[in-house]
Structures are given as structure tokens and as C-alpha cells.
């Protein structure tokens, strides 16, 4: 079969790289078996979705890619430090290891800025200045900086803006939670305290009640369907 070109090779490398950033325990085995199939079939392995190994790597890739895409829009930077020695600091708590991806994304956009992105779950940070690097961090020190040296003036302005553009009659917390799940909101300034956060928490509680009720109704429907089928068999 003719070669499918560098594009497919690059695509395969991207999928494997993203899969390696997954938090799933089986990622190493999945990548190993995927590569074995790749050496056997070549670039066309990417289209062989009937192979379990190919499907699993694609699932891992898609999970990391989707979470990375969301965090690109949900990362919020705060100004940290004293006058003349300030940096932009963002904190995240992702399921997967996103620092290499997010770091490069924001380095391309804030090339002249000194910034850091901290992954609270892994106690790691991506630091960008004259050079860029990943490093383990002391979370106690990060907490002290976050609480004691964060400039909140712009945060308060953004919270005011967030509330002022809202249209009361069009508020839809179910849709909001779908588009911006609660697990992403820990360090999103528009949800960190104040009226917006209180309303969101109340809405989250109401939504959970609806979900529980829907789940109970679904269980009841399944049981009724099961009894009906059994009755038909007896008849």
C-alpha cells in the first residue's frame, strides 16, 4: 500500500502523545499494544477502529483533548506579587495531565508575559519567562501567595461585569452547568464568591434533585417494562 504521508504520521504521534497524558491506569498497556499494531499495519492502523487497541488509544486521546479544549477557555489568571515583581498565576485541577498542552497554548499567546499555571492535583507547575519549564511545587507556598499577594481589583470588576450582563429572564443554570461543569469552576473568578456563586450553588442543588428524581423515574420505568415483558412471556 502507498504511504499516506507525513500528515498521518503526525496524527498518530499526536494521538499517542495525548493518550500518554491521560490519568487512566491502563494508558501504558493501551499505547504499547497500539504501537505494536502500528508497526504491523503502518499508518492505516488509524482507520482500523475494529481493533480494541486502536479504539482505546483514541478514547484516551479524545478525553484529554476535550478537557484541554475546555480548560483553554476556563483558565483564569490573577496578578500575583509585589510592585515591580508581578507574574500572572493560574490554578487548575484537571483529571488529566494538561500542563504541557495548556502551557504551550498560553505561551503562544502571552509570549512576553511571565506566567505560571499550577496543577493542584499533581503539585506541579508550568513556568514561563525567559525560558519555559515544568517543575514540582510547594502547594503550601502557592496557597500563601494566592491568599496574600493576589490583586483582586480586576477580579471584582470582572465579577461585576459578569453579573451586570446577565438577563434575569434568561437565566438557565441547567444549561450553564452543562456548558461549564462545576468541576472547572474552582478558580474561575466569576464563580468565586459573591451573588453569582451563591445562585450557582443553589441551582446546582436544585439540578441534583431533578437528576435524582429523573433517575428514580427511569428505574421505575425499567422495572415496569421488565414486569410487562415477563407477563407477555407467561401469556
Regions inferred by a protein language model and the residue ranges of each:
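Internal, well-folded beta-alpha domain core
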Residues: 47-137
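C-terminal active-site/capping subdomain that shapes the small-molecule cofactor and substrate pocket
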Residues: 136-138, 144-145, 152
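Long, compositionally biased intrinsically disordered terminal regions
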Residues: 114, 126, 149-215
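Charged, compositionally biased non-catalytic regions
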Residues: 14-67, 74
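Post-transcriptional modification and biogenesis factors for structured RNAs
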Residues: 1, 222, 229, 235
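Single conserved hydrophobic/aromatic residue that forms the stacking wall/gate
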Residues: 1-10
